Structures are given as C-alpha cells and as structure tokens.
C-alpha cells in the first residue's frame, strides 16, 4: 500500500520536473527513479532530445561524402580539367607583346623567333634585334598594305620562295645584319633595299633580281662576300654601296654601256667600292658615263 502511494505521488510531480536546457544537459545521464517504466520514459526522452538537438547538427558538421567513381569522374571533367597543351604558335597577342600605333608595329628586342601575327591594317613592321631565323610566305599573306619591313639584327638565313610576292605596295625592305647567303625575289615597287652585313655571294643573286625594280633608288649590299657587282642594276639607282666585299673586277658594262659612248647615267649620286681587291684605276672606261667617280682604290 505504501509503495503504491509513493508511485502515485511520483506520477503527480513528474510534470513539474523540467529537464535542463540542451546546452546544460549531460546526454549520457539516464534518470532512474526506481521504476522500470520511469527509467524507460526518461531514457526515451533523453534519446529524442539528443537526436533532435544534437545528433543531426553533429552529423552535418562531421559528415564526409565519398563520391563514387562516376561522380568523381564528372567532377574531374567539369572543375579540374587540365588546360590544353600549348600550341607552337600560341603566343601572346602581338599588340601586347609589341607596340601598335596607327598602322605601325614595333617588335624590337622582344626575343621573338618568328614573325608574329600582324593586324591586317599594318603598313610598317619594325622587328629589329630579335631571333627570327626564317621568313615564310604565310608571314605576310594577309597583310597586303605593308610598305616597310625592317628585320635588322636577326638570325635570318632563309627566305621562302614567294615570301614577298603579295606585297605589291612594299617600298622599303631591310634585312641588314643577318645570315643570308642569297637574295629572294623582291617586290616590284621597292625604293630601298638593304642587305648589308650578311654572307651573300655573287652566285646567291640571280641575274634578273634587280632588273625590273624600276623604282629602286637605294641599294646597300656592303659587307658581304660578293665577287662581282650585281648585273642589270636599274637606271633609277641613286646610291649603291658595295664596299667591303670581295669584288676583284668590273667591266665597261658594269655601270655604263660599252656600245654607247653618249650614254650618261645622271641619277647616280654615290657608288662606294672601297675595301675590295679591285683596282679602279685599271678600268677607266667603266666610269665614263658617271658624273662622279666611285669611292675606292685607284692605285
């Protein structure tokens, strides 16, 4: 009877007992009030409190998701795909590497080893003192308005056939200080051609190389390995520099016309032949058509 009364009193006071807040509860405690039913009730309540207040949160904080092979492959493909391999000509845009100003492109001393892609409106290219070894037809295929090219101080030893064939407006071509052994076919409207300080020999210049260049005024072929003066030099020439080659002789037809004693070549202002083995004094008839004698050795 006393036991029954005690049990009833406990049931009456249980609703008045409030559990501590979740932050103050010890989730490991199981309240035991001396009866199996009460123990089970409080154990269930504690379990629910743990599940609702802490378990889900803790699981979110510590959950580690291990993707299967398929999802990992998708993630790899979409988020960490490696960059494609760099192409041979995949370089920095020309106008970032060089300076582009109103149709002029300045690529001087930037260590390029090939002609960079040029803006289509380019008229002047200065690519001096680089490491360019070869010029090809595709370098200028889509740049028809070029008027001046300057490749001074490169390593050019080969110029592909047809490289300048589409440059009908080109007026000045400078290939000084390179490694050339021969000359390419030159565009017809050239007024200046400069190929000094190369390794050009006479056999590297075809007989008709200069013949049709009716606008050519300035020709610089000094400091090469020429054994003779190039043939068929155009009447338009004003300045001819051939000093410091290996020229050993000249003829009456080199600058004049042996069969026409009245012929005067009045446009030529300067011919330089010093530094060659030839003795100009031995060929007096070679200069009778000139207003000024060539510079060189006469004795």
From Swiss-Prot:
Its main location: secreted. Glycans are attached at residues 89, 215, 246, 259. Residues 1-19 form the signal peptide. InterPro entries: Leu-rich_rpt, Leu-rich_rpt_typical-subtyp, LRR_dom_sf, Mimecan/Epiphycan/Opticin. LRR repeats lie at residues 113-132, 133-156, 157-180, 181-200, 201-226, 227-247, 248-278. One of its GO terms (cellular component) is extracellular matrix. The keyword Signal applies. PROSITE patterns: LRR (PS51450). It comes from the Eukaryota. Contains keratan sulfate. Keratan sulfate attachment is observed in the cornea but the protein also exists in other tissues without keratan sulfate. The 12 kDa OIF in bone and the 25 kDa KSPG25 protein in cornea are probably proteolytic fragments. GO terms for molecular function: growth factor activity. GO terms for biological process: articular cartilage development; bone development. Disulfide bonds join 256-289. It is found in: Secreted, Extracellular space, Extracellular matrix. Keywords: Disulfide bond, Extracellular matrix, Glycoprotein, Growth factor, Leucine-rich repeat, Proteoglycan, Repeat, Secreted, Signal. Belongs to the small leucine-rich proteoglycan (SLRP) family. SLRP class III subfamily. Induces bone formation in conjunction with TGF-beta-1 or TGF-beta-2. This is Mimecan. It comes from Bos taurus.
